[in-house]
């Protein structure tokens, strides 16, 4: 069981997504180890400005209506390990985020971002997280109808923005 799973023990819905960066593992790892928060902020703000919208960390369009919120991300731990018998290296960042303003209106996310080489020139970003919907029982009902899809789309966009930023920044 991973650290997030051990911490939350399935206390919320799960989200998993991945993307890749066409740069060697060591360069991607070093960029995220050096200052992951700046990478996350730069990636999401750059994506928001490209879309000519208000800069926000998480954003998703639902039926043509944009939902955006700034988030406060904290990196709880960074660890390096070997994935398999072939000594494939991996780095895991334990993340937590919540809305920067009015956090009770948005889910709390606890996640792992694992980084490992796919090839000598490509690196995988693998996100696995659990989130707690707001509003208790009512929030769980809303989550079952539409909330989980909103959370999935926003996390997918976040990882896509981070991967896109790293592709350009490391070029």
Language model region names:
Residues 91-99:
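Short Pro/Gly-enriched beta-strand edge/turn motifs at strand-loop
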Residues 71-84, 109-117:
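Hydrophobic/aromatic beta-strand elements that line small-molecule binding cavities or substrate pockets
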Residues 28-32, 125-127, 162:
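Hydrophobic pocket/interface hotspot
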Residues 12-18, 90-92, 108-110, 122-126:
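Intrinsic-disorder/low-complexity, polar/charged segments enriched in Ser/Thr/Lys/Arg/Asp/Glu/Gln
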Residues 100-152:
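Beta-strand/loop substructures that line and gate deep hydrophobic ligand-binding cavities in soluble
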Residues 22-26, 82-90, 114-124:
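A short, structured loop/turn motif at beta-sheet edges
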Residues 159-171:
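Short, highly charged C-terminal tails/helix-capping segments
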